[in-house]
Amino acid sequence: MYKAISFDKETKLLRKFVKLEFEMYKDDSDWVPPLIGDTISMLKGKNNPLFDNGPHMCFLVLKGEQVVARVLAGVDNELNKAKGIKQGYFSMFECSDDAQACKVLMDAACKWLNDIGMDSVIGPISPCNGDDRKGFLVWGQGMPVLLNAYTKDYYPRLILEYGFTKNENHRAYSMKPPQAAIERHIKVSEYARKKYGYSVDRLNVRKIVDESKDIKEILDHSVPDNWDYLNTPSLEAVIQEFKTLKQFYNGYYTFIARKKGKPIGFMVALPDYNQVLKRMNGRLLPIG
């Protein structure tokens, strides 16, 4: 007997929601456990700009007394307004290899979205409007790097059999360029910088608001209008993203290019902290 339950910020149920992932992947040596406390805080809305943009709901499916599936559903009102759509989203999908459990779960989530006026659903997206947990892994092997999705190989089958269709493919690449190539690119970049008169500076974390304004300006001019699922983040969201990333780095790997003081490009690189998170088993400290 399957039963779906919905909830918002109940800590006990949120812990069950988060811990299901640990049960699902406990025998998978490549899985990287998320930090339990941070994940629960994010699901309560702390430092989560997506939850500020509209309603959301968590769903669990029980088979008897056992939790066998979960999903987060919600609405990004800012995105819908910008695109002129009525679209809901789902995120953090986890499910046993059981088509009926998937059906009960997604029926509950889709009905809730329909009841609040949505006529379409997309996912899985990031639960905090970031780049983590997007999509399902359909090809690849080994431990994922930071921010890359890692999911069960049968998830695409479950979600397609339920009735969703594939929207697009995302790819992640790995490379280790030879030293000669690095040196050549350095020379080319120095030449281009002098010829075209632009500067490249590291992010100044002491001026994070001003730096975020420049990054916001770049994003406003570079995000394509035809990406239905993506809207330019607000200034507050950009600032919050950098505040969140501060736990991983100090700004050393972020650069902003400017020409005559006007921002024209930026890039963010992160160390692969999954190498560390893997050994922490979801906890910053051994006792909690």
Q: What name fits each language-model region?
A:
Residues 21-64, 71-81, 202-288:
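A conserved beta-strand-loop-helix scaffold within acyl/acetyltransferase catalytic domains
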Residues 74-78, 93-95, 126-128, 178, ...:
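An acidic- and aromatic-residue-enriched active-site/binding cleft used to recognize and process polar
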Residues 2, 149-229:
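Acyltransferase donor/substrate-recognition loop-hinge adjacent to the catalytic core
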Residues 127-135, 176, 271-278:
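Flexible glycine/acidic-rich beta-alpha junction loops that bind and position SAM and/or redox cofactors
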